[in-house]
A protein has these predicted regions:
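Conserved NTP-donor binding/palm subdomain of two-metal-ion nucleotidyltransferases/polymerases, i.e.
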Residues: 2-132, 138-394
Length: 394
């Protein structure tokens, strides 16, 4: 774990608690565990809650306590919280099953991926990883029927008024929420920084029909595409959601034996996602317990871009409790992820948007008054640290 020695002690314990797979992974950790003071344990607890890793960290700290005998002041409280989280996840899973059964009954082919699928295939325990949405991917030609079914189940669009509003803005998915607190992300494309809206056939070629042992209806991504997708998700969120890096690491560990490395590299080439996975693997190599697949993916000297990304994405920048400004986050994502050409295009789009781009931003026909309003809104988002989307402020 290159550079691990320079990481502060409470962060070291948090990172091990994210990566431990068995009680024995805490052997030899008595000294760093004892070095964490009360404030440090509170910090670890807050990180676990903020990144949706409360259950995983609580279980693994329980192992640490059992294996080393070191007292962990926040463990009892985190264990109670983990039980409460389990009840929430059971409710979300019930809602997801209702959605899956309705789509299946209508003969609509769909893929369940991200949080819900990772809990089944990687974590194996609903209490370990929190998720908010049920993410499903459908064929574009079946999008409207799938949307209608979700409406019939009581789900409504969370941001725009109609599905067409998402389509004209070149979105890849739409979030829909229910009065019972559940929500679903309906996707018709999968994309990343360097990957435009995906050719559906490429995605479907790497998905598998449901198996009888699955807890939920719906197709699943192959192990190779699952690993790629969690890396893409980490990148798309400009490296702010640390849970996605943990997803990547644990997917590599748990599904590594089923991943065809040649097929993985071939798919990375087709989707233009090699750099994305390379950076995720190098961060895992730095922070987590060594793993053969991670080492293979991070082998060789890093590219100039990967070297720059890893210098920017330090443990302190990734494990921060305060939210960074949206524009600051976007700039970090562009510097760390985009190729030179795409980064230049993105910076131009941010600083000098074209008429069509402003139309998509404002949702109406272009007029010159959009330019001053665009810069005022962006300045407010930058200096006001607001988390609201542009459309809510325009």
């Amino acid at each position: 774990m290159t550079g691990f020695a320079t990481i502060q002690t409470d962060h070291k314990i948090f990172l091990r608690a994210c990566a431990a797979l068995r009680p024995e992974d805490w052997d030899g950790q008595e000294a760093p565990l004892k070095a964490v003071d009360a404030e440090g344990w509170e910090h670890i607890s807050k990180l676990a809650v903020q990144f949706g890793l409360l259950g995983l960290v609580a279980r693994n700290l329980g192992w640490a306590n059992e294996r080393t005998g070191v007292a962990i002041p926040v463990l009892a409280r985190m264990t109670v919280w983990r039980q409460g989280q389990l009840m929430q996840m059971l409710a979300h899973r019930k809602a997801a099953r209702r959605i899956g059964e309705a789509l299946t009954a209508a003969g609509i082919r769909f893929v369940v991926f991200k949080g819900m699928a990772l809990v089944d295939a990687v974590y194996g325990d609903l209490s370990l990883r929190a998720f908010r949405d049920c993410d499903i991917f459908v064929d574009r030609v079946r999008l409207e029927p799938a949307y209608a079914i979700l409406q019939d189940l009581g789900y409504s669009l969370a941001l725009h008024e109609s599905l067409q509003d998402y389509l004209v803005r070149d979105k890849a998915g739409a979030n829909m929420s229910h009065s019972d607190g559940s929500s679903v992300d309906l996707h018709w494309a999968i994309q990343g920084y360097e990957m435009g809206p995906s050719d559906p056939e490429i995605i479907w070629r790497h998905c598998r029909p449901p198996e009888p042992s699955q807890g939920l209806p719906g197709w699943r991504m192959s192990p190779e595409l699952t690993l790629i997708n969690v890396a893409a998700h980490y990148q798309v969120h400009e490296y702010e959601e640390f849970k996605s890096l943990v997803d990547f690491y644990l997917t590599a560990v748990k599904l590594g034996g089923r991943i065809d490395i040649d097929e993985l590299f071939k798919t990375l080439q087709v989707l233009n996602m090699r750099q994305t996975v390379d950076i995720a693997a190098r961060l895992c190599q730095r922070f987590f317990i060594p793993n053969p697949l991670v080492e293979r993916l991070a082998a060789g000297p890093p590219s100039l871009h990967a070297r720059l990304a890893c210098r920017i994405l330090t443990e302190k920048s990734l494990l921060r409790l305060d939210k960074i400004r949206p524009t600051e986050r976007r700039l970090r994502g562009l510097i760390c992820s985009g190729a030179v050409a795409s980064s230049a295009r993105a910076f131009r789009k941010m600083l000098l948007p074209k008429a069509r781009e402003l139309e998509l931003r404002f949702g109406r026909s272009f007029d010159l008054g959009m330019y001053p309003k665009y810069y005022i809104v962006q300045a407010y988002r930058l200096f006001g640290r607001t988390r609201k989307p542009f459309s809510d402020l325009a």
